[in-house]
Every structure is written in C-alpha cells, then in structure tokens.
C-alpha cells in the first residue's frame, strides 16, 4: 500500500489493514526521484511533474507517482489504522523479505541476519541507519 493519503484514502487503507492484517500488508512508497526535494517542477521520463505538498502530479492533474518516504508512510499507517509500531513494523520489512525469499538474512533483527536497521524516534523521524552493520548518522 502507498500510505500517503493521496493514492488511497485513509479509510480505505484502514479497511484493507483490518481485513488483511499485519502479516499480509506491505508498505511501499513507489517514490519517484523528486522524493525529498522542495516543491517545484521535475522531470519524469520526459514529462513535467509538479510537486506541491505531498503530491506529484502531471500538468494534466493526473498523479505522476509518489514522493512518500518510508518513515512517513509508517507514520501515516499508524495514524490511519490506530495500530502500534509493535504490530506495524513488519509491513515495512519482514513481509517484503518473506515474499522475496530473503527473510533468512533480511526483514528483521536476529543473530545471523544482515544488520540493516533504521532507527526512528517516537514521531517516526529517522535518527540513524545501520547498513551491513555499519553506522550512518542521518543528521
């Protein structure tokens, strides 16, 4: 699910999560390269994309893609579903790793798995990332 409140209404996301649960939902971003950039005009495959607020649209008004960051998607999912991060974390990583058949090394924290970890604060802001066990300061 692209949980930006633009691609899908918050009530639709809450319904899908209630019906499917945390073991069957996947949080994705489908983000284009304008993600994290200021409002303005960007190119997407030769098409002019206008980024304003949390939306990326073509000049026709059609959605051009997402500019959602994963941590913002998680924050939205918490808000839209009323569930906790203790239940929702797996929709950001483990479910995807299981589908790809790489959950033996990715998707959760366990001895023997790759240490790819994003540390967030209570407001879902990224504080630190760890990639292959190496610390990368975010701020």
Q: For the regions a protein language model found, what residue spans apply to each?
A:
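Active-site-adjacent C-terminal substructures of enzyme catalytic domains
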Residues: 1-92, 98-103, 120-125
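C-terminal cap of metal-dependent C-N hydrolases
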Residues: 98, 108-139
């Amino acid at each position: 699910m692209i949980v930006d409140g633009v691609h899908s209404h918050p009530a639709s996301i809450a319904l899908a999560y209630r019906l499917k649960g945390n073991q069957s939902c996947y949080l994705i971003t489908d983000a284009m390269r304008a993600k994290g950039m200021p409002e303005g005009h960007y190119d997407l495959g030769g098409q002019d994309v206008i980024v304003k607020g949390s939306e990326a649209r073509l000049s026709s008004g059609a959605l051009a893609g997402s500019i959602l960051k994963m941590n913002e998607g998680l924050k939205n999912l918490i808000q839209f579903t009323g569930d906790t991060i203790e239940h929702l974390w797996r929709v950001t990583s483990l479910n995807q790793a299981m589908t790809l058949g790489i959950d033996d090394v990715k998707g959760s924290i366990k001895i023997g798995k790759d240490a790819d970890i994003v540390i967030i604060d209570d407001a879902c802001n990224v504080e630190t990332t760890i990639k292959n066990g190496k610390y990368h300061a975010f701020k």
